[in-house]
């Protein structure tokens, strides 16, 4: 029987949803990940979610490891078959979340393509109003990643949930208690936004954290600016970027966060390819040190 997990924050990683999910989890489980976030790109309609959940939970049985969330990343706010499939994927994941032992479904909020962010708010409300109710009826929460996917305030293809101003507008359009954020510092840092003040302000709405950091090359910015020929920001695995995750986890704890920090790999410019899992396990151990190992108080 697995030892009871005492801490309120787990450290895990993202896993692609599909035919290789179960075997991938089986192989990396010994590294010490405490949670897994199963993610789909655009659609999950080709996956038997019930069977996947059964197979995953069989692998995790007795380990104490959990599925933190199930996710689908696409643009549900547009017309066309791809957007329709993405909306249907949200529905199916909401319905199947409990089979995985989670109450959290995450992804992109979507966007009306190449229109300013405010133009998406009516469509966002129309799409996610029913989805939020469907989720609430099943005890499920929804969370949107704060990823701009190359978009700006004026134009973009994927996601409106980019910055605190966007989150305020989304909340005003659809003030549902079961809608929150899938937050990470990286997506703010690459826009030169300090992530810590927003973390303190929004921690109560953060349902899930992606473990991803950034390195900002200030020497490049000073010499070339942010529109010059040199790249000045890089997505990094935690432990290799600029953030102090001891501070981040302290603020999460102080704000009452109970949930998972799951490493979002496959972005680091150094620890990639053959070094992907080397970097992820280094990030896992770093985040565990920042969290500190739970030690029960003496009972006297």
Q: Can you say where each PLM-predicted feature lies in the sequence?
A:
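A short helix->loop->beta-strand "cap" motif at the edges of active sites that frequently abuts
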Residues: 65, 102-103, 140, 255-259
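Catalytic-face loop-and-helix region of soluble metabolic enzyme cores
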Residues: 214, 253-254
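Active-site groove signature of glycoside hydrolases
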Residues: 99-118, 141-153
